[in-house]
A protein has these predicted regions:
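Membrane-embedded alpha-helices and immediately adjacent juxtamembrane helical segments
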Residues: 1-282
Length: 282
């Protein structure tokens, strides 16, 4: 038992040493900067999806209330209400262009940190650029699917009851799924986050890193990001003096700190995987 605890402690110290030595907190700060630039174009696209399907904005914000800090939701809600009256194709195109530019830049920052951790030779610039653009489009698809999952509710299951063949409707437990959906959709959102993290980890890791190791580190990172977001939301909700310290900038500071935490956890998952693979080789 003592030997196992020593091994865990040594593993943790090795991860901490690698994390600080590689300057991952600096990379997380750069990543959070690009995430801020990505957020508002993403909200433009979300606004377009809401208007396209005539969905309820308040339902989206209420569904995310348990996952995101209140300050982050405040910024998102204010911005979405601001752009809600505009469904301009030019505005959407500008948002998509900015999204691809900022998201691909953030991904390249993440890949550079992963190259340093794994001691990879940096690939051709155009190849890395193309990969980051493709992953940015995948990120946009994930956002779209997340919006669909959030807005899927009782109306959707009622629609299935009306249009599915009777035999199929009897086989599928629609009533049970309808009651459990308020929790199942959070599980689906976690799966979307996990899938995106796994794809990024796999794309940035060298080929000698096994899929099993990528899966375990991705699970750790995705779970940590979700858990940290919930805890951070609870902590901010309990802190009544936060707005007194930062005034009108409180929501923006909460957003920046939350994105910085998420960036650190994403890179921490890479550091854990690197130490794991290095120990496996010994």
């Amino acid at each position: 038992m003592v030997k196992k605890l020593r091994s865990i402690a040594a593993f943790g110290l090795e991860v901490a040493d690698l994390y600080t030595g590689a300057g991952l907190s600096r990379s997380a700060a750069a990543l959070s900067y690009f995430l801020v630039l990505t957020l508002f174009p993403v909200l433009l696209c979300v606004n377009y999806f809401i208007g396209l399907f005539h969905l309820n904005l308040e339902q989206l914000l209420v569904s995310l209330d348990q996952l995101l800090p209140q300050g982050v939701l405040g910024i998102m809600g204010d911005y979405l209400r601001y752009v809600a009256g505009s469904q301009s194709s030019a505005l959407l195109l500008a948002g998509l262009s900015t999204l691809l530019l900022s998201a691909s830049s953030g991904l390249r920052t993440l890949f550079l940190a992963m190259d340093e951790l794994y001691q990879n030779a940096r690939p051709h610039v155009l190849r890395r650029l193309a990969l980051s653009v493709v992953l940015s489009l995948l990120f946009l698809l994930t956002v779209y699917l997340s919006v669909v999952v959030i807005f899927t509710g009782d109306w959707f299951f009622g629609l299935l009851r009306q249009h599915l063949p009777r035999r199929i409707a009897q086989l599928v437990p629609l009533e049970l799924l309808s009651r459990l959906w308020s929790w199942l959709r959070y599980l689906l959102l976690f799966c979307f986050v996990l899938l995106l993290v796994l794809i990024v980890y796999r794309a940035g890791a060298p080929r000698w890193v096994s899929n099993r190791e990528v899966l375990l580190s991705g699970l750790l990172a995705a779970g940590a990001i979700v858990a940290a977001s919930v805890l951070f939301s609870w902590f901010i909700g309990m802190s009544s003096r936060y707005a007194l310290v930062y005034g009108s900038l409180a929501s923006l500071m909460i957003l920046l700190v939350w994105l910085y935490f998420c960036g650190n956890l994403l890179l921490l998952g890479v550091a854990v995987n690197r130490v794991w693979t290095r120990r496996r080789k010994k």
